[in-house]
From Swiss-Prot:
GO terms for biological process: phenylalanyl-tRNA aminoacylation. Residues 375-455 form the B5 domain. Keywords: Aminoacyl-tRNA synthetase, ATP-binding, Cytoplasm, Ligase, Magnesium, Metal-binding, Nucleotide-binding, Protein biosynthesis, RNA-binding, tRNA-binding. The gene is pheT. Belongs to the phenylalanyl-tRNA synthetase beta subunit family. Type 1 subfamily. The keyword Transport does not apply. GO terms for cellular component: phenylalanine-tRNA ligase complex. InterPro entries: aa-tRNA-synth_II/BPL/LPL, DNA-bd_dom_put_sf, Fdx_antiC-bd, Fdx_antiC-bd_sf, NA-bd_OB-fold, Phe-tRNA-ligase_IIc_bsu, Phe-tRNA-ligase_IIc_bsu_bact, PheRS_beta_core. Gene3D superfamilies: 3.30.56.10, Bira Bifunctional Protein, Domain 2 (3.30.930.10), Ferrodoxin-fold anticodon-binding domain (3.30.70.380), Nucleic acid-binding proteins (2.40.50.140). GO terms for molecular function: ATP binding; magnesium ion binding; phenylalanine-tRNA ligase activity; tRNA binding. It is found in: Cytoplasm. This is Phenylalanine--tRNA ligase beta subunit. The lineage of its organism: Bacteria, Pseudomonadati, Campylobacterota, Epsilonproteobacteria, Campylobacterales.
Amino acid sequence: MKLSVNDLNVFVNTPKDIAKLCEDLSRLGLEVESCIPCIAPKNVVVGKVLEKAPHKNAEKLSVCQVDVGKEVLPVVCGAKNVAPNQFAPVALKGAIIGSTTIAKTELRGVESHGMICSSIELGFPKINDGILELDESVGELVLGKELHEYAPFNTHVLEISLTPNRGDCLSVLGIAREISAFYHTPLKPIKALNFTPTSDLITLSADENIESHLAYYLICNHSLKTPLNIKLSLAHNNALSENDLNNFIEFSAHFSGVILNAYSLNKTPIDLIIKNDENNLESVYINHQKRSTIVIKHQDQKDLSECLLLEASYTDPVSLSLKLHALKDKTLQKDNALVYRSTRGSNPNLSDGLNFLSAHLKAAILESKQTEHSLKDCALTFQLEDITEILGLVIEAEKIQNILKNLGFKVSTKEPNSKPQILEVIVPNFRHDIKTIQDIAEEILRFVGIDNLVSKPLHCVSSKNSNPHYDTHRFFENLKHKALACGFKEVIHYVFYSKEKQQKLGFEVLEDPLELQNPITTELNTLRTSLVCGLLDASLRNKNLGFKSIALYEKGSVYNSKREEIQKLGFLVSGLQKKESYPHAKGKAWDFYSFAECVSRIIGDFSLEKLTTQTPINHPYQSAKIIQNNEIIGVIAKIHPKVIQELDLFESYYAEIDASKLKRPAMLLKPFSIYPSSVRDLTLIIDENTAFSKIKKALKDAQIPNLSEILPLDIFKESGNTIALSVRCVIHSLEKTLNDEEVNSAVQKALEILEKEFNARLKG
C-alpha cells in the first residue's frame, strides 16, 4: 500500500513531523516499510511556453520562449510534446537536476537559459513521455513560483505493510481514520452530493440469492481528462494508466476504499439485472448482456459514450473467499488487484465512492439506484474487567470509550447502574476484522501502546501429561538405538511364514481352525509364531552375500496357537563377533556369555535359569530362560549344531523376548559408600544341582548387615554329586570403615545361612 502525505491531507491534517508520523503508524500496527521524500528541487519554477520555434542546427530540438514571471528566457528543448501556451516546470540557473547543475549554456549555437523538465528529472514517477504539463489541479499556477511550494511537489510517499485482516486500511481514507483517531484530529468526510433525479431510465432487478450490495449513478456531461494531481497520486502507487476513465475509477477506489466500476451507455432504457453466472458468481447483465463479474472482473472501457453508469459494489470478504476457493480448480477470468482488495474487505459505504468519483468527474447525476440489501450491525457486549483480564492492564472506562468512539465504534452503557459496568459496542461496518472481545482488546492496546504493558511473570503449574502409548513407543525406539549402537542391524519380515518350517524347528503353530483360509503362497501359509525363523533366513542370505559377521535385530508381531497377537524382540548373531583384525588375526567368534552380555546392554540386567523343556532349535547345554524383575521374559540359546548344518549357517545364537514384559526402569537414586569396601573370596562344597541364583536370593533375603554384593567366580567338579563353587562377598558400610571383626561377622553369618539352607561347607 503506497500513498503520499499529500493524499492523506485530503481527509485529515497530518502532523508536520513525518518521522514521528511513521513511528506512530508502525506502533498502531500499520508498519511503514519506507518513507521517501518527493520534493521538487530548488530553483525549479512554474513557467509558460509562449513560443516554440525549430532549432536552426538540429531537427529534434526546438527553441522556446518561456515566461518565468520576472522575465522571458530562451530555452532549448528536445521534448516532442512541448507546445505554446503550456505550463511546465522550468529549472533555472543554479538548480540541481539529478547530478547536473543548470547553467547558461549554448546548445548547437543557440543560447539556453534553463531546462524544461519531465517528472522523472524532478525525482517523481513517470507521468508521460516528454515534459511535465502543469495544470490548476495542483494549485493556482503563478509564473515564477517555486514548484516545491505546491503540496503535490513537496510531500513524502509512504509504503505501508498491512496484515491481511486490515482490508479497511487498503485506502487513503482508511489510513486517515487511524491518524484521526490517534491524534484526535477531525476527519474530513466525503461530501454527499445533492441532486434531483431527472430521468427514469434504469430498471434494477436482483435475484433473491444475491449477497452483494450495489449502488448506481447514471451521469452525463462528464470530464474525462485526467488532471495532474490524480496522475501524481496514481503514479506514486504504480497504478497510472493511459485510459482516463480507468484512472478516475482507480483514483476514487484508492482514496475511498469502495470497489467502483463504470459502464458506457446510450441514453436509452436500461434493463439492469443482477444474477449468478455459469460459475455461480454474481454478475451484472445490462440489456441481457453480461458486462462484469462483481468484485472479480471488470471490463475495460474503450468506446465511451456521453452517459456513464457508475457502479459501487461490496461483497462480504469471507463469503467471496469461500466461493473463489471452491472454484480454485477452474480457470476464471479475474483481476488479481481487484480480487485482492475485495477478499480483504472493501468499504461498504457505497455512497462515499460514488460521490467521490462523481465529484472528480464533474458530472451531472441523472438517476441513482441501489439494491435493497442492508448490512447487519455486529454488536458486542463486555465488561471492563474483561479488557483488564485480557491485557493485564487496568484502563479507565472513559479512556476505553473514547478510543472506540474515535475509531468509529458506537459505544453505549448497558444497564448504567450495574456493577461491574457493561458496555455494548456496535462495530463500524468497514471493520471486517472485529468479531470478538479479544479484537476489541487489541484495538484498545494499539492506542494505549504495547510498551505501556507491565511485564509480569507467568504463574502456571504444569501438570505431567503422560501418554502411555507415546512412552511405550519412545521406550522401544531407545532399545532400537541401543541395538544399533551394539552393532545390530534392524530387519523387518512379513508376519506370514511357512507352517512346515516352524514345526520342524520346534515352534508352536496355529490351531487348525484358525489357520489362514487363503494364504498368499504355500511358503507363507500361516502366521509366524516366532521371530527366529525370519532371522535365520536373513542370516543365511547375508552369509551367501559374503558377510562373515552378522548381527540382526527385529521387533514385530507374532501369534500364539490361539492366534493372539504378541509383540516380541528378536536378536540373532552369526559368525564372527570381531572381524579378522589385530590382535584377532582369525577373528573372534561369538560365545554364549558374550552374546548374553551384549543383549543385557540393550534390555538391561537379567539373570538366566536352565530351560526345563527343550526344542529342536536349541542347544541342550547352552540355552536358558531370561529372568528380569523375577519374571520370565524370554529365551536365549545357541542354535543346535544339527540345525546349523541343515541350514548351512555359521555358528549362531539367538534371543527372543516378550516385549510386553519389558519394563521401563525407574530412575531411582541410591546412596553409595565413600568408605573402602572389603572383599572375601569363599570356596564352597555344595550339591551340583544347586543354582547360584538360589544362593544369591537366600543371602539377599537374610539382609545380612554390610553384605552388599555376592558374585560367582569359578566352579570345579568335586567327587560324587558335589562341586566346588567359588564366590566373592563384597562388604562395606555407608557410615564408616569396617574393621576385621565386623567383616568376619558378615562372612560368618553368610556361611551359617548357606550351611542351613544348602548344606554347604567351606572347602578345607
